Amino acid sequence: MDFDTITSISTPMGEGAIGIVRLSGPQAVEIGDKLYKGKKKLEDVDSHTINYGHIVDPETNEVVEEVMISVLRAPRTFTREDIIEINCHGGILTINRILELTMTHGARMAEPGEYTKRAFLNGRIDLSQAEAVMDFIRSKTDRASKVAMNQIEGRLSDLIKRQRQSILEILAQVEVNIDYPEYDDVEDATTEFLLEQSKKIKNEINLLLETGAQGKIMREGLSTVIVGKPNVGKSSMLNNLIQDNKAIVTEVAGTTRDVLEEYVNVRGVPLRLVDTAGIRDTEDIVEKIGVERSRKALSEADLILFVLNNNEPLTQEDRTLYEVIKNEDAIVIVNKTDLEQNLDINEVKEMIGDTPLIQTSMLKQEGIDQLELQIRDLFFGGDVQNQDMTYVSNSRHISLLKQARNAIQDAIDAAESGIPMDMVQIDLTRTWELLGEIIGESASDELIDQLFSQFCLGK
C-alpha cells in the first residue's frame, strides 16, 4: 500500500531535555537529507543507526539545531516504512522550526494515530494490537501496562485467529455436506464434527469473557466513590490511600466542593478513587453543584466506600445515604476510632446487613490494610489473577465476543434441531466475521478511522 510521507512531533510539547520529530514514508530519508548536514548523507548510512550532525535551513544555510538522527529502513520498522527520527533539544521554538522545515520540503503533518494506523494497514499489527498501544500509553498501574503489553505482543490476536481457523475448518466440512447431500454418512459426520468444534469454540469465548470484568478494571480502573456526611473523614481516607494531600482536609463541614479523582494501585487492583462532596441539602450554589456531581459519580461507581463517624450517633442523614447505595457493591467504614465511641455498631450492622464493615482511624492510619484486603476480596475473590493471562479489557472486544457467542450458539441449536446445513452455515459465517472485527480483518473503514482518531498526535 502506497502512502505519502508524514511528520509530527513525537514528544510532549513544552521545555525538556530532548524533543523528537518523526517522519515516516517513502520520502522520509530524502527529506531528512535536504535538512541534515553530517559526515555522510542519510541515504548512505546503515539502517537502525543514529547519526550526529546539524539541521540546516536549505534556503538560508542557517544552522538551526545540533541533532542526532535515527535512520530506520523498511520493513523493519513500526510502520513498515522508512522512518527517521530527529532528536534535538527540547525547546518549543526549535522543535517547531524543524517540524516546519520537514513540511516545507515534502512531508505532511500526521493525523492523530496515523503512525499506528499505518502499522495496521501495512500488516505490522492487527486492530486489537493497535488498540492495545493506546491502552499501554494510558495505563495507570504496572498490572494494566502488563495486560496491554501482552495484547500488543499478540496474545489475544493469536487466540482469535485460532478460533477463526477452526470455524473455517467447520465451514469446509459443511460445504462437503451441501455439495454431496445424497451421502448420509457425510451428513452425520459433518453434524458431529460441527457440534464438537462449535461447542469448543463457544467454551473458549466464554473463558475470554470471564476475564472481561477483571480486564476492564485493569484497563479503566475500578471506579470507587467515597461517600458520607460532611466531615466524617472522606478526604483523609483518600489521602491515606493515595499517600498524597490533593484533597483539602479541614474541620469545616462541606470543604470538598467538587469531585476529586485520583488513581491508585491497591493490592494489584487499580482504583480510580473519587472523593465527593457530602450529599446533603444546601443553599450554597457552589456546594450544590458539587452535590449534584457526587450523585452522578455514585450512579456510575463500581464500588462505594460509605464512611461513618465513630464519634457521632447514627443519624437520619446516614440512613438516607445508605438507602441510596444499599443495592450497590459497597464497603461500610466506621472512621475516627481514635475518638470516643458514640456510634452504636450493632445499630450500624442492623442497617447494613451483609455489607462488609471495616473500622479505621485515618489519623493513626489504622485499618487501612484491612480495607485494602476487603476491596481486593470483594472484586477478585481474594485472588488477583496472574497478569500473564490473556485478558479481554476493551468494551468493543467484549461486545463482539458476546455477539459471536450468540451466533455460534445459534449454529449449535440449528444443527441439533436438524435444520439444513446451508442455514447453519449462515450462523457460522457470522461468528467468523464478528471475531474478525476484533482483529480488524472484517472491520469497516469508518470503524478503523474512528478508532485511530482517538490516538494522540505523533503515535
Curated annotation (Swiss-Prot):
Q: Which Gene Ontology molecular-function terms are recorded?
A: GTP binding; GTPase activity; metal ion binding
Q: Is tRNA processing one of the keywords UniProt gives this record?
A: yes
Where, per UniProt, does this protein localize?
Cytoplasm
User: What Gene Ontology biological process does one annotation of this record name?
Assistant: tRNA methylation
Keyword terms, alphabetized? Cytoplasm, GTP-binding, Hydrolase, Magnesium, Metal-binding, Nucleotide-binding, Potassium, tRNA processing
Positions contributing to GTP binding: 231-236, 250-256, 275-278
| GO CC entries | cytosol
Instruction: Locate the residues binding (6S)-5-formyl-5,6,7,8-tetrahydrofolate.
Output: 22, 85, 124, 459
Predominant location of this chain?
cytoplasm
Pfam families found in the cross-reference section:
MMR_HSR1, MnmE_helical, TrmE_N
* PROSITE patterns for the chain: G_TRME
- Please tell me whether the keyword Cell inner membrane is annotated for this protein: no
Cofactor needs:
K(+)
Query: How many cofactors are bound and how?
Result: Binds 1 potassium ion per subunit.
Q: What is its EC number?
A: 3.6.-.-
InterPro entries xref list: G_TrmE, GTP-bd, GTP-bd_TrmE_N, GTPase_MnmE, MnmE_dom2, MnmE_helical, P-loop_NTPase, Small_GTP-bd
Q: Where along the chain is Mg(2+) bound?
A: 235, 256
Q: How does the record describe its quaternary structure?
A: Homodimer. Heterotetramer of two MnmE and two MnmG subunits.
* Role of this protein: Exhibits a very high intrinsic GTPase hydrolysis rate. Involved in the addition of a carboxymethylaminomethyl (cmnm) group at the wobble position (U34) of certain tRNAs, forming tRNA-cmnm(5)s(2)U34.
**Name by which UniProt lists this protein:** tRNA modification GTPase MnmE
